[in-house]
């Protein structure tokens, strides 16, 4: 705890990264052993996000190295770029990793969802996107993840969630009365790569026993429910080789500990909750998380969120019980194809779960239909 407190620098703190000086404006977010600051280049006042990681253990050093390596390995329009980085000795036994990243003023997808719930109520049935826009946005996220899965060896992101997707060029329709003051200027979470959005006060599990969403009014074809933005994937400290063979209890417990520290329960695949001593884990853990993400984009909550007063372990019980049905009501009549895509991604049986290339193919088919 002490090291984290010492990392919370004042607003006039100056960092030197490879000879360039940056001054802290404010903190954007924090999580684990890192803080993210809004900084400006002293030479031209350009704004950036600076992620500072204080590493006191070999494990945290390895996490920082993995994140830097992922930034340097992948080049895709929907994957965040690393502008610069430096490493310094914070103290005798502690290294400080500094990652200079683009600053996205529109915040994260989670900010957008939270804003929607703030305006319309936490149980709102008003979606952020109509179906086509939702799938177009989601397709770009899938294509970014596909870069990881196509790597040799295949890699898994392992922490796909709305808080790890920042928004570029966010556009809200001009006739939306609510697009000003609440317009994601809670960007305090901008590049808060590893912020634990698992507690995102979203704690309403919308699995009402209402009829399928298709029995709702389709009055939301109105323009005010449609937004546009470019998703940018971030937070690569959780990236690991996707295909892991678990051969004994020691392997299982080691992986269990790792995923509990580096993944978000609401988006965690069922095979990662109670890992058997003889099993194979692969990149379809990301497909599960993506299915939960698509559900959240459509229905404003992860399908597996729990309330504050629910006991520990409730998330695991919900996940292991499978996707709640029927789907909650919505002001948008999402098609049966759309909902079936979610069902096929959030499949308890990983061997029956879609692969990402199949997901992308299905998305394109639905968009074109």
Curated annotation (Swiss-Prot):
EC annotation?
2.7.11.1
Known SUPFAM superfamilies for this protein?
Protein kinase-like (PK-like)
Q: Which reaction does it catalyse?
A: L-seryl-[protein] + ATP = O-phospho-L-seryl-[protein] + ADP + H(+); L-threonyl-[protein] + ATP = O-phospho-L-threonyl-[protein] + ADP + H(+)
Residue ranges constituting the Protein kinase domain according to the UniProt record: 22-367
What keywords sit in the KW lines? ATP-binding, Kinase, Nucleotide-binding, Serine/threonine-protein kinase, Transferase
**Which Gene3D superfamilies does its entry note?**
Transferase(Phosphotransferase) domain 1
Please name the catalytic residues of this protein.
159 (proton acceptor)
Question: Where is region (Disordered) located?
Answer: 169-225
Low complexity bias spans:
175-221
User: In the UniProt record, which is one GO cellular component term?
Assistant: cytoplasm
Top enzyme class, one word, equals: transferase
Q: InterPro entries per the record?
A: Kinase-like_dom_sf, Prot_kinase_dom, Protein_kinase_ATP_BS, Ser/Thr-specific_kinases, Ser/Thr_kinase_AS
Transcription regulation among the record's keywords?
no
Would you say which domain of life the source belongs to? Eukaryota
Q: Where does ATP bind?
A: 28-36, 51
Q: What's a Gene Ontology MF term here? A: protein serine kinase activity
Q: Which PROSITE patterns match?
A: PROTEIN_KINASE_ATP, PROTEIN_KINASE_DOM, PROTEIN_KINASE_ST
Which is a Pfam family this sequence falls into?
Pkinase
| UniProt KW Kinase keyword | yes
Q: Which PANTHER family match?
A: SERINE/THREONINE-PROTEIN KINASE 16, SERINE_THREONINE-PROTEIN KINASE 16
Hey, which family's this protein in? Belongs to the protein kinase superfamily. Ser/Thr protein kinase family.
Name the chain's protein.
Answer: Probable serine/threonine-protein kinase DDB_G0291350
Report the source organism: Dictyostelium discoideum
| Record lineage | Eukaryota, Amoebozoa, Evosea, Eumycetozoa, Dictyostelia
